[in-house]
Design a protein with these regions (language model features):
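Catalytic domains that recognize anionic headgroups
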Residues: 21-66, 166-201, 205-207, 211-690
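Glycan-recognition and processing domains
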Residues: 24-180, 197-200
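Intrinsically disordered and other compositionally biased segments
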Residues: 6, 17, 297-299
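Bacterial N-terminal signal peptides that target proteins for export
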Residues: 2-11
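Hydrophobic h-region of N-terminal signal peptides that target proteins for export
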Residues: 10-21, 683
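N-terminal regions of proteins, emphasizing targeting and processing segments when present
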Residues: 16-17, 109, 123, 490
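Short, flexible helical or helix-coil boundary motifs
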Residues: 14, 109-112, 656, 690
């Protein structure tokens, strides 16, 4: 069973709202208030509301059950695909049933020098295991447990760091501080069980009541979770109408039932929806789509000889603006997306690709949430997992299992359901899919796309070795299918009448190499095939058919959207590209340094204008002029220019280091003396504290 965090009310709540008469004339409904932990007197520790995942969906919650760490072991060897160890637990474990135990695992691999290095996502965070492990207990001493963990794919020299955990209790009764309830408001309530009842016959009752201005209490919710409803790992939703408005209202929440089961009952952050003032200009919706691993030069709108993206060409490039020269900051999923969501270069983050709860960097979802947007995300897990910090700011963060055969299909279907459920609200929707990612799987209907004969024609000079051309063909087929998936989603946006009121952004986190510079995949190089990403934008005030050639970065997406929405800027390193849109003119500012990095020994690089520098500790520096050599095949031999570019890189690195140090120091200051030791143990168990 998983324990993480977030919101699943959109479909149920949206249908309830429509059924109750919330028609299109209420198109300016916004989130007027979120009743977070502080409204209920709860200590949030690091400053952000706790997030709890039930099943595939995570939501911010008022109070989460603490995770008790019963045992913590490091250096457990893996032999023949199996890790096994025995530990003596405390006396409280004697009476705990087997299904009350949880297991969290972290992989660590040792290199010859003896240093520990990260091994995939599980090296960054503990990963709670839902299966592939067993707990053995002798009848005469149930507190002495043996754990077996299946690790058939573990790399050589990998050991495990393991925690045996149990879920503690959440508060059973909560009462909010007074708040104002606007006329015609609606409450969105989410509730669920952090784990199924230990007793199959167990049940929990959830009750919500509202008391306003001294009037009699109004019961908003009185539901029991038992049987199949209690065993199902999912959130439950309600959208009650609170009745009369009030100047001073209190929301009272209660969970009751068997002692153990009631302790696992949790409430998502309640939200109050109300109409936006009529005299305030309406805010636009935002849809942000990330097609993981999509390099820009494989889209036909970017000049690729194959028609890989005819639908996006027509629906986005022709109806909006295409940014020709955009780069990521780190060609890996987590760091690239974190730059997208924070507007910060990868080198400025204390841990690239990971946002701790106390690090004072604002995410796009947090900025839009604070502006009254309903926020939802549908991802395909893996390196975009919520535990890395991506779920902060989202009212709903859904992680679908990464299944190659269904990549994209479920994600865009979820996105379409979100649109239908929230068409009368201001929303921010983030969709992420690995559809284009290796192993480049596409449906049989696309088998005839990407003719191998193209390698003797339009693709002859692409620099791809013959042994990699079949991979490129498969990659292009996956892009072509992703193109149709995006188009079907955009058609639903049109059908619902939302297209003219919604900014749509399609981009990626990084590209993909096919041997052009001796590398395959991504993450381990700084050449354009890994860094150059698409950026397509359409919506109000965005010129149709526009093209912007000014070099830009993935960090510019956040400030651009806030600028277009008329929202105040946040402290980010990116800059708004709105000036390149209005009047279809280019940004007039002087070229700015655009730093980036990749996996390598002191690997770092910088783009300044058309000049690009790649530097590592174990290789001579490489200097290119992308204006005359876009494929980076002719390194420049120009000592003066190299010295200048090294100075630019040093300046960019100093700026990143200053921000990184400030963020880390602020995070430590916010952390220190705030969270109790038990909270810190829970954060360690969830992977937030190493």
């Amino acid at each position: 069973m998983k324990l993480r965090s977030f919101l699943r009310h959109a479909a149920v709540v949206g249908l309830a709202a429509l059924a109750s008469g919330c028609a299109r004339d209420d198109a300016r409904t916004e989130v007027a208030l979120r009743l977070g932990p502080a409204h209920f007197g709860r200590d949030t520790g690091p400053g952000r509301a706790p997030v709890l995942q039930i099943g595939e969906e995570a939501r911010p919650v008022i109070d989460a059950p603490a995770v008790d760490v019963l045992a913590h072991r490091r250096g457990i060897p893996i032999r023949d695909g199996l890790a096994r160890f025995t530990v003596q637990l405390g006396p409280e474990a004697r009476t705990m049933p087997d299904d009350a135990f949880l297991l969290a695992v972290k992989r660590v691999r040792s290199v010859p020098a003896g240093d520990e290095i990260e091994v995939g996502a599980s090296a960054i965070h503990f990963v709670r295991r839902d299966s592939a492990w067993r707990l053995l207990r002798p009848a005469d001493d149930p507190s002495r447990v043996t754990i077996e963990v299946d690790e058939p794919d573990a790399a050589p020299d990998t050991t495990l760091e393991v925690q045996i955990q149990s879920i503690g209790r959440a508060a059973s009764e909560l009462e909010s501080a007074p708040f104002a309830l606007p006329p015609g408001a609606r409450l969105l309530l989410g509730y669920g069980l952090a784990r199924p009842p230990l007793d199959a016959a167990g049940a929990s009752a959830f009750r919500a009541a509202l008391a306003c201005d001294g009037r009699a209490e109004v019961v908003l919710l009185d539901e029991h979770l038992a049987g199949a409803a209690a065993q199902a790992a999912r959130w439950h939703d309600a959208a009650p109408e609170p009745g009369d408005a009030g100047e001073s209202c209190r929301l009272r929440l209660r969970v009751s039932g068997t002692a153990a089961d009631a302790g696992s009952g949790v409430w998502a952050t309640p939200m109050i929806l109300a109409r936006a003032p009529r005299d305030v200009p309406p805010r636009r919706n935002v849809v942000l789509i990330s097609l993981d691993t999509l390099r820009a030069d494989h889209l036909s709108s970017y000049g690729y000889p194959r028609a890989t993206s005819p639908r996006m060409d027509a629906l986005l490039a022709a109806r909006g603006t295409l940014f020709e020269d955009v780069a990521t900051t780190f060609p890996l999923t987590s760091p690239g997306h974190m730059s997208l969501m924070t507007g910060l270069f990868a080198g400025a983050m204390p841990r690239p690709g990971v946002l701790d709860p106390w690090t004072p960097a604002t995410l796009l979802a947090e900025a839009l949430r604070d502006a009254g947007y309903l926020t939802g995300a549908y991802t395909e897990d893996a390196l975009l997992a919520g535990l890395f910090g991506f779920w902060f700011g989202f009212d709903r963060f859904v992680e679908r299992p990464l299944v190659a055969e269904a990549r994209g299909t479920a994600t865009f279907a979820d996105g379409a359901r979100f649109l239908r459920a929230n068409r009368d609200r201001r929303f921010f929707l983030f969709l992420h899919t690995y559809k284009v990612h290796a192993p480049y799987v596409s449906s049989p209907a696309y088998a005839g796309f990407a003719d191998p004969a193209d390698w003797d024609g339009p693709l002859a000079n692409r620099g791809v070795p013959p042994e990699r051309r079949a991979d490129v063909d498969a990659y292009d087929r996956a892009i072509r299918e992703a193109d149709d998936q995006v188009a079907a989603f955009l058609a639903e946006l049109d059908r619902l009448g939302l297209a003219d009121d919604t900014y749509v952004v399609v981009t990626s986190d990084h590209g993909e190499a096919f041997g052009e510079h001796g590398l395959v995949g991504h993450g381990f190089g700084g050449h354009q095939e890994q860094l150059h990403i698409p950026l397509l934008l359409r919506g109000p005030e965005v010129p149709a058919g526009g093209r912007v050639a000014t070099p830009a970065s993935i960090v510019d997406v956040l400030p651009t959207l806030l600028d277009l929405l008329g929202l105040p800027p946040i402290d980010a390193q990116g800059r708004s590209l709105r000036a390149a849109l209005t009047g279809a003119r280019e940004v007039a500012a002087a070229p700015r340094p655009l730093p980036f990095t990749w996996i390598g020994k002191e690997a770092r690089g910088v783009r300044h204008g058309s000049v690009k520098l790649l530097a590592t500790a174990d290789q001579p520096p490489l200097l290119f002029d992308l204006a005359s050599d876009p494929d980076e095949r002719r390194p420049l031999d120009d000592p003066a220019l190299l010295a200048t570019q090294r100075s630019v890189l040093a300046s960019a690195e100093r700026a990143d280091a200053e921000r990184r140090t400030a963020l880390a120091a602020a995070g430590e200051k916010r952390q220190g003396g705030v969270a109790s030791e038990r909270i810190m143990e829970s954060l360690r168990a969830l992977g937030y504290v190493q």
